[in-house]
Every structure is written in structure tokens, then in C-alpha cells.
Design a protein with these regions (language model features):
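Outer-membrane beta-barrel porins/channels
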Residues: 23-37, 44, 65, 81-83, ...
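A beta-strand signature from Gram-negative outer-membrane beta-barrel systems
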Residues: 55-56
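Bacterial N-terminal signal peptides
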Residues: 9-19
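N-terminal plug
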Residues: 61-62
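Bacterial N-terminal signal peptides that target proteins for export
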Residues: 1-10
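Short strand-turn segments of transmembrane beta-barrel domains in outer membranes
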Residues: 42-44, 67-77
């Protein structure tokens, strides 16, 4: 039996972001397959490798043999905040720009599919569909009382079964188990104008958790009305993760001022258990693919994220509940449009794509904790089929992100 493999589907997604108060819309990661992302992710109707586990599980019923996919993306967000306030005490001051610490993230993608019999396919996958990495200079950043570091990691396991009753229709359903962990870090500042003291760092607060599971489901359909046309759609349900085993640690930062240090010692909360709730939105996608020539495919997709599930971020403390807090986010449902094209020539496939991603964050929710803005993405990709039976494929893509500047306002604590 011929066994197609997709090995090392290298997704080199260097995010070339304009310096703005932004990262990505929400905290979704759609970079889940190199071939698809070469077309800017427009693949709901045309995906034809094992990444169909993510992009459209209904396609599994039409994949022959056994297929494996191993890959990932290198994501390098660049974010800055520029002060626009003119009131006394505005942070940062008007015209002052502060840069986020540069980081690179490598979310993995692993898929395996198998055709059980004609018209029946099965697939499993592990990926990271959501994540957030924000870090600011803990000693100098003017917004350090909001956040100095945020690290949200997810690992999602999917299992899907697809059925094709005929050559035109195929359907799929599956289950998702998402494991999420979070780290939140910030500083507490102290000011006393009567003593001439301003913005002294006195307490560092850190909340961390282990991986905690949440569960969801998915469904998909693929329709081929004619040889040149394909219509596809999928749905992934929301996942809510209740983090009940977090640990909140409070560390005093000595100022060298005896009276201040004694005061902080007297009010310093003890290390204690904490909890929060992490909400991941449902996702709808619908796409249409057309082959104008045997060696060409073009596709357009429309995606809808139900970000309105992300209403707030509660921080609950067990020992000192009076210090618990809830950060209001009130995200709105948002949409994306993705278009792409692929040209196949011999053993090579050349890809290009474009997308627009509408930010779900209202202006008052834009902050150093969750910077966000509308974004435009442009991608280029290439695939190479090799091996004795051309059953190995190496795919790579590059993705440039260009974000609108976004103005947000956050009150001092």
C-alpha cells in the first residue's frame, strides 16, 4: 500500500509586525499546517494532507492510505506601546515608546490519518490552537502594575472520524481535549506624595498553574458538486478550562526605605492557592475552492470566532479573597477572510495567500496584558514532493503580519 507521508512540514512564520500596541487578534493560533498557511490558511475546501484533522476533518474520508504530518511554526511577535495621554501621571508619557521583550514561540503540529475502508477515514492530532506570550521589562515598563509577563500555553488533542456516502459528500465528527496552563506576573507600586515617593516597586505577584483539561467537539462537511469545485465547512466548539489548582505567590521588593519596607511587610499577603477561568471561543469556517486548470487551485474562506465567550479574566484568591479581582474584557465575535492560490509544477507547489483578521477586543480592553488590533497577513509557500514514489513532502511558508495601530486606555490601580 502506498503510504503518503508529510515530514517536517516546516512553517517558518516570522511575524513581521509593525510597531504597535498589538500582537494577534485575541489569542488564537491558526498556523496549524505549512501547506495551508502558504495559502494564508485558505484550505477549508482544498486541504489534502493530514492537517485536515484541523482544517477540515471531512476530507479524511478522501485521503488514501496512512499519512503522518510533523511540523510547527516559529512565531516572533513584535509589540510596542506609545503614550498618547497628556494628563498628569499618564503612562507612558506622551510620545514615549516602550518595546515588548522579543520572544520566539514554536507551537507544534502533529497529525496522523488512516483510511479504514473506502469512504471511511480516521485522524488524530496534537496542536496548539491558542496561546499568548507577552513579556515587558519588569523594572522599567510603565505598565508593570498591569502585567510584566503573560504565558498562556495550550495542547489540544483531536480525534475525528469521517464518512463519505458517495463521491460528492463527506461528513466528519470528533472530540477535542484541550490542556491549558497559565502564568500571570505583575508588580504593585507605592506612591506617597507627602513623602516625595512615587512609583516604588514593593510587591511582585505571580500566579501559575499546571496543565488543566477542558473538552469540546468538532464537525465538518465537504461537498464536491463538480470536478473543479469543492465546498467545505467546519465547526469547533468553545472550550472552557476551570483552573482550580493555581498558586499565587507574593514576593516583597525591598526599597531601602525602612518605613516603607516595614509597611509592606505588614500588608504582604501570604502565598496561597488561587483559581481562574480560561475561555476559548467556538470557530466556524466555510470555504470554496476552484481549479481553473488541472495545476491550479484557488480558494476563499470566511471564518467566524465566537470571541464573546471571553467576558472577563477572574483572579480568585483563597486565603485573602478580598484581594481577588476580575478584569473585564467583553470581547466581541469577530471574523476573518482568507484567500489563497496554489500552482503545481512537477514536484513543486508554489503558494500565495492574503487574509484580513478583525480584532475582537474593544478599545478599553486593549492593554499590556492583551495587546490587540486588526491585522493583515500576506503569505508565500512552497512544497516539494520527493522519494521513490513521491510520497514524502516538505512544505515551508513565510507569513508577514501588518497591524493597525490601536489606542487603548487603562486606569492606574
Amino acid at each position: 500500500m502506498r503510504r503518503p507521508w508529510t515530514l517536517l512540514a516546516i512553517a517558518v512564520a516570522m511575524a513581521l509586525l509593525l510597531p504597535t500596541l498589538a500582537r494577534a487578534t485575541g489569542y488564537a493560533i491558526y498556523e496549524q499546517g505549512a501547506a495551508a498557511l502558504g495559502m494564508a490558511g485558505a484550505s477549508t475546501a482544498s486541504v489534502k494532507d493530514a492537517s485536515a484533522v484541523f482544517f477540515n476533518p471531512a476530507a479524511l474520508a478522501r485521503l488514501e492510505g496512512t499519512r503522518f504530518y510533523v511540523g510547527g511554526s516559529a512565531l516572533a511577535p513584535i509589540t510596542s506601546v506609545t503614550g498618547v495621554g497628556t494628563a498628569d501621571g499618564a503612562r507612558p508619557e506622551y510620545g514615549v515608546t516602550e518595546e515588548m521583550v522579543k520572544q520566539v514561540f514554536f507551537p507544534p503540529t502533529i497529525y496522523a490519518t488512516h483510511r479504514l475502508m473506502k469512504g471511511l477515514g480516521f485522524g488524530i492530532g496534537v496542536n496548539s490552537p491558542y496561546g499568548l506570550g507577552v513579556e515587558w521589562d519588569a523594572d522599567e515598563f510603565s505598565g508593570r502594575y498591569i502585567a510584566t509577563k503573560v504565558d498562556l500555553q495550550t495542547l489540544n488533542g483531536s480525534a475525528c472520524l469521517a464518512w463519505a456516502p458517495n463521491d460528492q459528500w463527506s461528513f466528519a465528527g470528533g472530540a477535542d481535549a484541550m490542556f491549558a496552563k497559565v502564568l500571570l506576573n505583575k508588580r504593585t507600586l507605592y506612591s506617597n506624595p507627602m513623602l516625595g515617593i512615587s512609583d516604588l516597586d514593593i510587591i511582585e505577584t505571580e500566579m501559575t498553574s499546571d496543565f488543566v483539561p477542558g473538552y469540546g467537539w468538532n464537525a465538518a462537511v465537504l461537498y464536491t458538486p463538480a470536478a473543479q469545485w469543492r465546498l467545505g465547512a467546519f465547526y469547533r466548539s468553545k472550550v472552557v478550562v476551570h483552573v482550580d489548582d493555581a498558586e499565587a505567590d507574593f514576593t516583597q521588593i525591598l526599597t531601602g526605605i525602612t518605613a516603607v519596607d516595614a509597611y509592606v511587610t505588614s500588608i504582604l499577603p501570604p502565598d496561597q492557592p488561587g483559581s481562574t477561568v480560561l475561555r476559548f471561543p467556538a470557530l466556524w469556517s466555510a470555504g470554496v475552492a476552484f481549479d481553473p486548470e488541472p495545476d491550479w487551485t484557488v480558494e476563499a474562506d470566511f471564518l467566524w470566532y465566537e470571541w464573546s465567550v471571553f467576558t472577563d479574566l477572574p483572579i480568585n484568591l483563597e486565603t485573602t479573597p478580598a484581594l481577588s479581582s476580575t478584569r473585564v474584557e467583553d470581547y466581541e465575535d469577530s471574523w476573518q477572510v482568507r484567500v489563497g492560490a496554489e500552482h503545481r509544477r512537477g514536484d513543486l507547489a508554489y503558494r500565495v495567500g492574503y487574509y484580513f483578521d478583525k480584532s475582537p477586543a474593544p478599545g478599553y480592553a486593549v492593554s499590556p496584558l492583551l495587546p490587540d488590533a486588526d491585522r493583515i497577513g500576506v503569505s508565500l509557500g512552497v512544497g516539494w514532493a520527493f522519494g521513490p514514489e513521491k510520497n514524502w513532502t516538505l512544505d515551508a511558508y513565510g507569513l508577514g503580519l501588518f497591524l493597525n495601530r490601536r489606542c487603548g486606555f487603562t486606569e492606574d490601580p
